[in-house]
């Protein structure tokens, strides 16, 4: 396996946005691959048994870090457990992996190896969260955004506007429920979704065309849409008074030029990594337990992969035998008009065995003893 990756550890969010993979182009170009993209992570997984042009892949992904083989597999299992996340143990990454895998499968872009890998990673992520406390406190990017707002500005008796009622917005909402907020407003392009989330928060929903009025009313604004373009620009916020805006959307909802406004304090995902986390130490203590699960499941995965490899060899061997059988049978049928059946069957069986022996001898001449002993295709069931 080959992984190309770029994440928050090496690049700030504005750079990651420019590095984002166009998934339509990606899946049109490659087979046996899956791309996983989040607000602070871009990763593409390749089955190199099928994508043999590794140099071509590396050329396409200059600037990305590269992992291969065992290192790539261990990395992905850690990612699924939230051990490689900005917020240790966060739950959202597991859902993002599932969604990415499902998309690749629907496009028929995975392989037997990648299917095994992703199903195993999902299982490992579930085990880690069930059997350990790596996700203690329900941590997420959404909850970190709320913690940032509370720590730096206080949320008591504040009016909060949540823009976006999708997955990320829901995570923010769950964190907001515990806070003593004066009023919560939810804005979303699909009003019904805003209304549903607002009811959970005991707040109010607004139509997107009333966004400016909602901004004027609010003290703190948390942006969490899935819009492909900016929804707030500098011109939209010049005359709205002093506001705190936390943008956790992917890609970003707020144009970076907004930082030039004196009345706006703008925070993005990069700012969340420094937020203190009261449960962090207890989650750090769970790392050895998670690593043990990863080690156990890695061994299981390797056995599954070995089985897949054997099945592939047997499939190729059966195809090879069938090809010889058909060719020799065609010869026997032609001879059946001129020779007796016993002689035909004798010649057929000898030709069949001779062809297999010839191919094996040709293979073994230039093969080391070790490689020859590890070759199973010629053993025919032994």
From Swiss-Prot:
Matching SUPFAM superfamilies, A to Z? Glutamyl tRNA-reductase catalytic, N-terminal domain, Glutamyl tRNA-reductase dimerization domain, NAD(P)-binding Rossmann-fold domains
Its signal peptide is none
The processes (GO biological process) annotated in the record are: protoporphyrinogen IX biosynthetic process from glutamate
Q: In which residues is substrate bound?
A: 38-41, 85, 90-92, 96
- Key word Nuclease present: no
UniProt site positions, description: Important for activity: 75
Write out the pathway annotation from the protein's UniProt entry.
Porphyrin-containing compound metabolism; protoporphyrin-IX biosynthesis; 5-aminolevulinate from L-glutamyl-tRNA(Glu): step 1/2
Name the chemical reaction catalysed here. Answer: (S)-4-amino-5-oxopentanoate + tRNA(Glu) + NADP(+) = L-glutamyl-tRNA(Glu) + NADPH + H(+)
Q: InterPro entries per the record?
A: 4pyrrol_synth_GluRdtase (IPR000343), 4pyrrol_synth_GluRdtase_dimer (IPR015896), 4pyrrol_synth_GluRdtase_N (IPR015895), GluRdtase_CS (IPR018214), GluRdtase_dimer_dom_sf (IPR036453), GluRdtase_N_sf (IPR036343), NAD(P)-bd_dom_sf (IPR036291), Shikm_DH/Glu-tRNA_Rdtase (IPR006151)
Q: Name one Pfam family in it.
A: Shikimate_DH
Instruction: Name the EC number(s).
Output: 1.2.1.70
Q: Where does NADP(+) bind?
A: 164-169
Q: Is the Oxidoreductase keyword given for this protein?
A: yes
What's in the keyword line of the UniProt record?
Answer: NADP, Oxidoreductase, Porphyrin biosynthesis
Q: Which residues form the active site?
A: 39
The family database entries (HAMAP family) matched by this protein are listed as:
Glu_tRNA_reductase
The protein's job, in short, is:
Catalyzes the NADPH-dependent reduction of glutamyl-tRNA(Glu) to glutamate 1-semialdehyde (GSA).
- More info: During catalysis, the active site Cys acts as a nucleophile attacking the alpha-carbonyl group of tRNA-bound glutamate with the formation of a thioester intermediate between enzyme and glutamate, and the concomitant release of tRNA(Glu). The thioester intermediate is finally reduced by direct hydride transfer from NADPH, to form the product GSA.
Matching entries from PANTHER family are given as:
GLUTAMYL-TRNA REDUCTASE
> Member of which family?
Belongs to the glutamyl-tRNA reductase family.
Assembly with partners or alone: Homodimer.
- Per the record, what about its domains? Possesses an unusual extended V-shaped dimeric structure with each monomer consisting of three distinct domains arranged along a curved 'spinal' alpha-helix. The N-terminal catalytic domain specifically recognizes the glutamate moiety of the substrate. The second domain is the NADPH-binding domain, and the third C-terminal domain is responsible for dimerization.
Protein name listed in UniProt: Glutamyl-tRNA reductase
Originating organism: Methanococcus maripaludis (strain C5 / ATCC BAA-1333)
Encoded by which gene? hemA
């Amino acid at each position: 396996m080959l992984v190309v990756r770029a994440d928050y550890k090496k690049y700030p969010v504005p750079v990651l946005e420019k590095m984002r993979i166009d998934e339509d182009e990606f899946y049109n170009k490659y087979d046996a691959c899956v791309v996983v993209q989040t607000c602070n992570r871009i990763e593409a997984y390749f089955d190199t048994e099928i994508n043999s042009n590794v140099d071509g892949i590396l050329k396409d992904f200059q600037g990305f870090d590269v992992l291969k083989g065992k290192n790539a597999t261990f990395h992905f299992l850690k990612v699924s457990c939230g051990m490689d996340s900005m917020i240790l143990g966060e739950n959202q990454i597991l859902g993002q992996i599932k969604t990415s895998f499902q998309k690749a499968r629907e496009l028929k872009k995975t392989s037997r190896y990648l299917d095994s890998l992703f199903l195993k990673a999902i299982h490992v992520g579930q085990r880690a969260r069930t059997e350990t406390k790596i996700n203690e406190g329900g941590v997420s990017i959404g909850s970190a955004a709320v913690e940032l707002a509370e720590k730096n500005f206080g949320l008591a008796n504040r009016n909060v506007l949540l823009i976006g009622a999708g997955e990320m917005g829901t995570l923010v909402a769950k964190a907001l429920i515990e806070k003593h907020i004066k009023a919560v407003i939810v804005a979303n392009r699909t009003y019904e979704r805003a209304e549903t989330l607002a009811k959970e928060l005991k707040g109010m929903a607004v139509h997107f065309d009333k966004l400016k009025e909602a901004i004027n009313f609010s003290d703190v604004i948390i942006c969490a849409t899935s819009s492909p373009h900016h929804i707030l620009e500098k011109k939209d916020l010049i005359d709205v008074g002093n506001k705190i805006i936390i943008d956790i959307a992917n890609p970003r909802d707020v144009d970076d030029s907004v930082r030039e406004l004196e009345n706006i304090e703008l925070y993005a995902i990069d700012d969340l990594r420094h937020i203190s986390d009261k449960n962090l130490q207890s989650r750090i203590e769970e790392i050895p337990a998670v690593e043990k699960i990863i080690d156990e499941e890695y061994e299981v995965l390797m056995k599954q992969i070995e089985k897949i490899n054997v099945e592939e060899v047997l499939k190729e061997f059966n195809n090879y035998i069938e090809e010889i059988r058909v060719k020799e049978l065609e010869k026997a049928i032609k001879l059946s008009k001129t020779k007796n059946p016993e002689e035909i069957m004798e010649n057929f069986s000898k030709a069949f065995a001779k062809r297999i022996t010839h191919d094996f001898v040709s293979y073994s001449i230039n093969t080391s003893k070790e490689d020859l002993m590890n070759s199973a295709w010629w053993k025919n069931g032994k």
